[in-house]
Regions:
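Amphipathic alpha-helix from the class-I
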Residues: 78-85
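Flavin-binding catalytic cores
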Residues: 19-20, 46-48, 88-127
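Short glycine/proline-enriched loop/turn "hinge" motifs that connect secondary-structure elements
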Residues: 63-70, 152-156
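A glycine-rich dinucleotide-binding beta-alpha-beta segment and adjacent secondary-structure elements
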Residues: 54, 108-170
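Active-site-proximal substrate-binding core of FAD-dependent oxidoreductases
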Residues: 190-197
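Mid-domain catalytic core of redox enzymes
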Residues: 1-66
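A conserved FAD-binding loop/helix module that cradles the flavin
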Residues: 166-189
Length: 197
């Protein structure tokens, strides 16, 4: 609990059996208070009353990701990590809330055309990725958790224990995570006296 975690997320993956006008590939729904949503994530962690959210509709730019005449829609609601109450009724409440706003924005009924729906949040981040407190992004990018203040690759207390990935040096993202793994592999090889590949 000494570190500040980045947000978690409530995600909805939707298959819709019709085209939805009014959406682009990337859509930000910042139609409610940004400040209040930030308070609900960082200062007073709780489920937001009026969440901001992101909608990705990749079928707008790549029709091959959905059957002809259909859409593939992804919805992301940023949330505080470690929230209690991540259950199906809560998820359904947020689904209805964002879909109401999405339908109002597009002027199109979408819910009746959903043929596939899956939600993903704290529980799955913990179960599938062992994500601390169910967070989605690891450590928050704060001044005291960047550059040389990031967690080190080599454990100071346990000999031979190394870490790699986005939470260590050099940082988040796929390329830095791969570089991190290469560096750790080199350190372990050196420790074991193995030749470099």
């Amino acid at each position: 609990d000494k570190r500040t975690m980045a947000p978690s997320s409530l995600l909805f993956y939707l298959g819709v059996n019709k085209r939805v006008g009014g959406l682009l590939h990337h859509n930000l729904f910042f139609d409610e208070s940004f400040d209040q949503h930030a308070i609900d994530i960082y200062e007073q962690p709780r489920w937001p009353e009026k969440p901001l959210f992101y909608v990705c509709c990749p079928s707008k730019t790549d029709p091959s990701v959905a059957p002809e005449g259909s859409e593939n829609i992804f919805i992301l609601i940023p949330l505080a990590p470690d929230l209690q109450g991540d259950d199906e009724p809560t998820r359904e409440k947020y689904y209805q809330m964002v879909m109401e706003r999405l339908e109002a924005f597009t002027g199109t009924s979408v819910r009746d055309a959903v043929v596939y729906k899956r939600s993903y949040a704290h529980r799955e981040f913990q179960q599938d990725y062992h994500a601390y407190k169910g967070n989605a992004y690891g450590l928050a990018n704060t001044l005291l958790q960047t550059a040389f203040l990031k967690p080190k690759m080599k454990n100071r207390k346990v000999k031979g224990l190394y870490f790699s990935g986005q939470l260590t040096t050099p940082g988040p993202g796929v390329p830095p995570s791969l570089i991190s793994g290469e560096v750790v592999a080199g350190e372990v090889s050196k420790m074991l006296g193995l030749p470099k590949n």
